Amino acid sequence: MKTFETLFAELQDRAATRPEGSGTVAALDAGVHAQGKKVLEEAGEVWLAAEHESDESLAEEISQLLYWVQVLMVGRGLKLEDVYRHL
């Protein structure tokens, strides 16, 4: 099972090694604007799942939102500690 920290480490590794065919690399290459649009899309899906779907569906939507937030963080060069300072 992945944690927030292990997912972030995996995304940083993908950004550094740029494996061919990686969806994460494609998302990073698409830039902050595209990443931000995905964050908004996934946030809306989380909201809808919270109101109308099962806990399992909600958890899956939250995981997708966390993925895109982390892709955006990596794209901007932020570290987890940059965010943790504000929690």
UniProtKB/Swiss-Prot annotation:
GO terms for molecular function: ATP binding; phosphoribosyl-ATP diphosphatase activity. Its EC number is 3.6.1.31. Pathway: Amino-acid biosynthesis; L-histidine biosynthesis; L-histidine from 5-phospho-alpha-D-ribose 1-diphosphate: step 2/9. It is found in: Cytoplasm. The keyword Amino-acid biosynthesis applies. It catalyses: 1-(5-phospho-beta-D-ribosyl)-ATP + H2O = 1-(5-phospho-beta-D-ribosyl)-5'-AMP + diphosphate + H(+). Pfam families: PRA-PH (PF01503). GO terms for cellular component: cytoplasm. Keywords: Amino-acid biosynthesis, ATP-binding, Cytoplasm, Histidine biosynthesis, Hydrolase, Nucleotide-binding. It comes from the Bacteria. It is an enzyme of class 3 (hydrolase). SUPFAM superfamilies: all-alpha NTP pyrophosphatases (SSF101386). Its main location: cytoplasm. GO terms for biological process: L-histidine biosynthetic process. Belongs to the PRA-PH family. HAMAP family: HisE. This is Phosphoribosyl-ATP pyrophosphatase. The gene is hisE.
